[in-house]
Amino acid sequence: MQQEATGGQKIRPIPIIASFLMAGFIGLFSETALNMALSDLIQVFDISSATVQWLTTGYLLTLGILVPISGLLLQWFTTRGLFFTAVSFSIAGTLIAALSPTFAMLMIGRVVQAVGTALLLPLMFNTILLIFPEHKRGSAMGMIGLVIMFAPAVGPTISGLILENLTWNWIFWISLPFLIIALLFGMKFMQNVSVVTKPKIDILSIILSTLGFGGVVFAFSSAGENGWGSATVLVSIIVGGIALGLFVWRQLTMEKPLMDLKVFKYPMFTLGLILVFISFMMILSTMILLPLYLQNSLALAAFSAGLVLLPGGVLNGLMSPFTGRLFDAYGPRALVIPGFIVAVIALFFLTRIEVGTSALTIIVLHSVLMIGISMVMMPAQTNGLNQLPPKLYPDGTAIMNTLQQVSGAIGTAVAITIMSAGQKAYMETAQGVGPEQMIASLTAGIQNAFVFGLIMACIGLLCSLFIRKAK
């Protein structure tokens, strides 16, 4: 931990983390808030559902491309400079989106927003590692977890309220003042805590990283809609896979790599990465499956579906500071192993949901699942990063955040693929093709997709048995 900022003044951790919390909350809120407005946007801009999905795909793609090179940016620019740049991009993107008269302009706004988020998240994690001692990092990461889990959870519900009374533009207008406040607060309190070393920039590594991570994220993001056999998906995953292979080979053979893969020599970091990867797959697949189930099988309106999922999301966020303090006191094993056990139980019962399952049952199961995941996510991530030496913090945070984006794309794509296959298999044996059969087939497909989540949770539980407090 650093006691002084690079300018010599004493570090004040609380105002620094408060700046990140404000900016991060709005950035992650806007990421999911727009999901509720997609059907409205199809009507407003007279576009297809495939086109409107680019608002999500484009956002994820930008994160997948920029987050891997964030480790380099953290070593080239000061903490204050990167913070102001990130929040400025978020403000600019939000303003462009709010004023958008066309879908193309809205798409540009979303990409600019994503640039801000891609810069902010790794900077936030890296700064916490630098300003908090190891025995307090769990609590600090817990506060960050509150934002990362809570903001996306309340996004759909708040946007549902906005859409009932105002137009979709107000999702962005309401976010704008809070981003400006975060920028002004940061101007006063943000301090430079990282050392600017300005390592050599390897252009080829950046190109390979962009093609590799961008290709993989795009392929999985497109697979759910276009199918795994489409030329777009196949070309993207082949190009992405080859580029990733070349990227890894180049990083291992360079004296000063863009992304230092020596982090994988630290077993608790690698294990933490695997556990976070699995957790994100479970979260993102659940976030795509349950709204489909609630709106189609239970015939709930979008706003009502958002309310059903709100308690679980809020609990997940509120649990993060609590699990952070428990991590500082008892280490990772006391949280991660029980967390996966809770997740396995919740997912087992989610595989058994039917057309007649009550909304209350879904609220309980979703809440239990979110509690389990909150016991895994931040403790596993913090424990893994704790094992790294300070010089590898930028690379560790970049890799951790990159794999989260990739796991989210993979989890969503696999869940949709399994669900679609389950629907098709059910309809092949169904008597007739009426509305009741369509609803029953969707429910059967969602059951199958939750089996995938259950298998991932069981794998996570087995892996968690090897976790130890990082030294």
Swiss-Prot record:
<protein>
    <recommendedName>
        <fullName>Lincomycin resistance protein LmrB</fullName>
    </recommendedName>
</protein>
<keyword id="KW-0812">Transmembrane</keyword>
<feature type="transmembrane region" description="Helical">
    <location>
        <begin position="55"/>
        <end position="77"/>
    </location>
</feature>
<feature type="transmembrane region" description="Helical">
    <location>
        <begin position="445"/>
        <end position="467"/>
    </location>
</feature>
<feature type="transmembrane region" description="Helical">
    <location>
        <begin position="231"/>
        <end position="253"/>
    </location>
</feature>
<feature type="transmembrane region" description="Helical">
    <location>
        <begin position="297"/>
        <end position="319"/>
    </location>
</feature>
<comment type="similarity">
    <text>Belongs to the major facilitator superfamily. EmrB family.</text>
</comment>
<feature type="transmembrane region" description="Helical">
    <location>
        <begin position="202"/>
        <end position="224"/>
    </location>
</feature>
<comment type="function">
    <text>Proton-dependent transporter. May mediate the efflux of lincomycin.</text>
</comment>
<feature type="transmembrane region" description="Helical">
    <location>
        <begin position="329"/>
        <end position="351"/>
    </location>
</feature>
<dbReference type="GO" id="GO:0046677">
    <property type="term" value="P:response to antibiotic"/>
</dbReference>
<keyword id="KW-0472">Membrane</keyword>
<feature type="transmembrane region" description="Helical">
    <location>
        <begin position="170"/>
        <end position="187"/>
    </location>
</feature>
<dbReference type="GO" id="GO:0005886">
    <property type="term" value="C:plasma membrane"/>
</dbReference>
<dbReference type="InterPro" id="IPR020846">
    <property type="entry name" value="MFS_dom"/>
</dbReference>
<feature type="transmembrane region" description="Helical">
    <location>
        <begin position="358"/>
        <end position="380"/>
    </location>
</feature>
<dbReference type="InterPro" id="IPR036259">
    <property type="entry name" value="MFS_trans_sf"/>
</dbReference>
<feature type="transmembrane region" description="Helical">
    <location>
        <begin position="268"/>
        <end position="290"/>
    </location>
</feature>
<feature type="transmembrane region" description="Helical">
    <location>
        <begin position="141"/>
        <end position="163"/>
    </location>
</feature>
<keyword id="KW-0813">Transport</keyword>
<feature type="transmembrane region" description="Helical">
    <location>
        <begin position="15"/>
        <end position="34"/>
    </location>
</feature>
<feature type="transmembrane region" description="Helical">
    <location>
        <begin position="111"/>
        <end position="131"/>
    </location>
</feature>
<dbReference type="InterPro" id="IPR011701">
    <property type="entry name" value="MFS"/>
</dbReference>
<keyword id="KW-1133">Transmembrane helix</keyword>
<feature type="transmembrane region" description="Helical">
    <location>
        <begin position="82"/>
        <end position="104"/>
    </location>
</feature>
<keyword id="KW-1003">Cell membrane</keyword>
<dbReference type="InterPro" id="IPR004638">
    <property type="entry name" value="EmrB-like"/>
</dbReference>
<dbReference type="Pfam" id="PF07690">
    <property type="entry name" value="MFS_1"/>
</dbReference>
<keyword id="KW-0046">Antibiotic resistance</keyword>
<dbReference type="GO" id="GO:0022857">
    <property type="term" value="F:transmembrane transporter activity"/>
</dbReference>
